Design a protein with these regions (language model features):
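C-terminal subdomain of the subtilisin-like protease fold in secreted/lumenal serine endopeptidases
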Residues: 14, 37-157, 173
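Gly/Ser-rich catalytic serine loop of serine hydrolases
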Residues: 14-28, 188-192, 205-213
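Residues on the solvent-exposed faces and adjacent turns
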Residues: 106, 111, 118, 128, ...
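Intrinsically disordered, low-complexity acidic Ser/Thr-rich regulatory segments
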Residues: 160-191, 198
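Extracellular S/T/G-rich loop segment that most often corresponds to the catalytic His/Ser-adjacent loop
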Residues: 1-33, 37
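Signature of short aromatic-glycine-proline-rich micro-motifs recurring in repeat-based ectodomains
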Residues: 81-84, 189-194
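Surface-exposed loop/turn positions within long extracellular repeat scaffolds
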Residues: 185-190, 202-236
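Residue-level detector of buried hydrophobic side-chain packing
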Residues: 20-22, 31, 51, 80, ...
Length: 236
């Protein structure tokens, strides 16, 4: 408790209900810790991707979160990926967000269906941005710059000049365009799986990622529909 009144002096133990990002952070961190104990052969970024892609955006009755507007499998502008779903997170990722290089030292089974919906959505967004900015060279969009700063006092250079804003936008556009072009040139808009390590990975889901599967070490097992979609006549 905060030291707000005589009944609740500072340091008195008790329970209370809080909301917002301050309380969301420890819950997400706790979920991440549980998943890291489940996937001990993965690095933190890989476990984070499982946390993201297996999150849910529905209430206990199956209804969507209030205000949820994104398509299934795509982060929402308000909620992001949603709420961690540890039950689903136990069974592998639900999407590949790029090249997933997994060094398996033991046995792991992924039974979730694995797609690349978020990657597909990002590709559409990036293509639209490249077109709107002429591949990052057109920085003439409106600059919403104020003439005065009304926040904290004694802040130097609080008002950004048009010249600085143009310079920063040009640098940002250039870097973003280069990053997008690199994804295009190297096929990074398709999720792929690379199996390393002496262990065994078993895939049992109906998987629709399009970047393929590479087995470098150990063993890899799965159904016909578990290795993603490739550009063959049969789609396998």
């Amino acid at each position: 408790y905060e030291d707000t009144d005589a009944l609740h002096p500072l340091g008195t133990p008790g329970y209370a209900s809080y909301g917002g990002t301050s309380m969301a952070a420890p819950h997400v961190s706790g979920a991440m810790t549980v998943l890291m104990s489940r996937y001990q052969d993965m690095n933190a970024i890989q476990v984070r991707d499982i946390l993201f892609t297996t999150a849910r955006h529905t209430n206990t009755d199956g209804s969507l979160f209030t205000g949820w507007t994104a398509e299934d499998g795509v982060p929402d502008v308000l909620y992001g990926w949603g709420t961690p779903d540890l039950d689903k997170g136990m069974f592998g990722p639900s999407q590949l967000l790029g090249k997933f290089e997994y060094k398996v030292n033991n046995l792991d089974v992924w039974s979730n269906d694995i797609s690349q919906k978020a990657l597909d959505a990002r590709k559409v967004e990036d293509q639209a941005w490249m077109k709107a900015t002429t591949n990052g060279t057109d920085t003439s969009a409106v600059y919403e710059l104020g003439e005065a700063y009304t926040g904290m006092k004694n802040i130097e250079n609080a008002v950004i000049s048009k010249e600085d804003a143009e310079k920063w936008r040009h640098e940002y556009y250039k870097k973003r365009a280069e990053a997008i072009q690199n994804k295009i040139d190297n096929g990074l808009y398709d999720g792929s799986l690379v199996k390393n390590g002496d262990g065994t990975l078993v895939l049992t889901g109906n998987n629709t990622f399009r970047g393929g599967v590479t087995l470098n070490e150990g063993s890899l097992y799965g159904f016909n529909d578990s290795f993603g979609i490739t550009e063959t006549a049969a789609g396998k």
